[in-house]
C-alpha cells in the first residue's frame, strides 16, 4: 500500500551505519518510515530527511513492517529559520510540541495547516519565543483542553481575584490550586484569550510581542498536559529492507 502526502520532517534518527528512521507530520498525522541508505551522502532524498523540511513523501506500507520511503520531493527548507538561532529554537519548540502531543497516524489536517502557517510566519515575529508559545496555546485549544471559563475547576465558583492558577488546561482559584499549577495574572489571561481567539496571523504577530515571562508560563502549562515520557508505539522496523 502506498501513501502520498505533503509533510514536514520533525526528526531523523540513525539506524545502523547507513540507514535512518524519520518521523514526519502530515495531514494524516505523525508517520514514521525507514530510509535505506538514508545516511549516505549520495542518497537521492537526503535533504527531505533533514528536520524542518517541507516536502511530498511517497511511502510504501506493508504491515506490520514500518513504512519505507520510496520517493520525496522537497518544497521548502525554511532557510531563514535555520539561519537564525532564535527562530530555530522557536521552531524546535513547536516541533517538540507536535512530537509530544500527537499519536502516530492520528489524522490532523487542521493542525498540520496551523503548524505550516506558523512556520511560514515565524520569521516575521519580533518575539519568536512568544510566537512559539502561542502555537502551544493553539495546540491546547485544538485538543479541547484549554479552559476559557471564569470558574474554578475544583469549587466551581467564579474567580474574582487578580490572579489564579492553571494546571493541565484547567483553571483554579487560589484556595484550590494544585501544587505544580502556574499562577496567571488577569492581564496575562486577557492576552491568552486574545491569542486563542485571534483569526488573523497579523493579530497573532502583534499580540506575541508580550513579555517573555508569559511564554515560560505557557510552556509550563503545556508541559503539565503533555509529558515527555508519553510513549508512542511505532510499527516494526524494516532494517533489512
From Swiss-Prot:
* Source taxon at top rank: Bacteria
A GO BP entry is:
DNA recombination
> GO cellular-component terms in the record?
bacterial nucleoid
InterPro entries assigned: ARFGAP/RecO, NA-bd_OB-fold, RecO, RecO_C
- DNA repair keyword on record: yes
| Keyword DNA repair recorded | yes
Keywords of the record: DNA damage, DNA recombination, DNA repair
Function comment = Involved in DNA repair and RecF pathway recombination.
What the record says about family reads: Belongs to the RecO family.
Please state what the protein is called. DNA repair protein RecO
> Organism, per UniProt?
Chlamydia abortus (strain DSM 27085 / S26/3) (Chlamydophila abortus)
Amino acid at each position: 500500500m502506498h501513501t502520498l502526502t505533503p509533510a514536514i520532517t520533525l526528526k531523523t534518527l540513525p539506524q545502523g551505519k547507513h540507514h535512518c528512521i524519520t518521523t514526519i507530520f502530515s495531514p494524516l498525522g505523525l508517520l514514521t518510515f525507514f530510509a535505506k541508505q538514508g545516511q549516505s551522502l549520495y542518497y537521492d532524498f537526503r535533504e527531505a530527511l533533514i528536520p524542518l523540511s517541507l516536502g511530498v513523501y511517497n511511502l510504501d506500507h506493508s504491515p506490520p513492517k514500518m513504512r519505507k520511503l520510496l520517493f520525496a520531493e522537497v518544497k521548502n527548507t525554511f532557510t531563514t529559520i535555520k539561519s537564525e538561532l532564535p527562530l530555530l529554537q522557536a521552531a524546535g519548540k513547536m516541533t517538540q510540541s507536535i512530537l509530544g502531543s500527537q499519536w502516530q497516524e492520528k489524522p490532523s489536517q487542521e493542525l498540520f495547516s496551523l503548524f505550516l502557517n506558523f512556520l511560514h510566519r515565524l520569521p516575521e515575529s519580533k518575539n519568536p519565543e512568544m510566537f512559539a508559545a502561542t502555537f502551544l496555546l493553539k495546540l491546547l485549544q485544538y485538543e479541547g483542553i484549554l479552559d476559557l471559563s471564569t470558574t474554578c475547576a475544583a469549587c466551581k465558583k467564579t474567580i474574582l481575584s487578580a490572579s489564579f492558577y492553571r494546571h493541565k488546561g484547567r483553571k483554579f482559584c487560589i484556595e484550590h490550586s494544585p501544587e505544580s499549577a502556574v499562577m496567571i495574572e488577569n492581564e496575562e489571561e486577557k492576552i491568552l484569550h486574545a491569542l486563542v481567539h485571534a483569526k488573523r496571523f497579523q493579530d497573532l504577530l502583534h499580540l506575541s510581542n508580550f513579555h517573555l515571562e508569559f511564554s515560560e508560563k505557557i510552556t509550563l502549562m503545556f508541559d503539565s498536559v503533555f509529558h515527555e515520557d508519553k510513549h508512542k508505539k511505532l510499527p516494526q522496523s524494516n532494517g533489512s529492507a
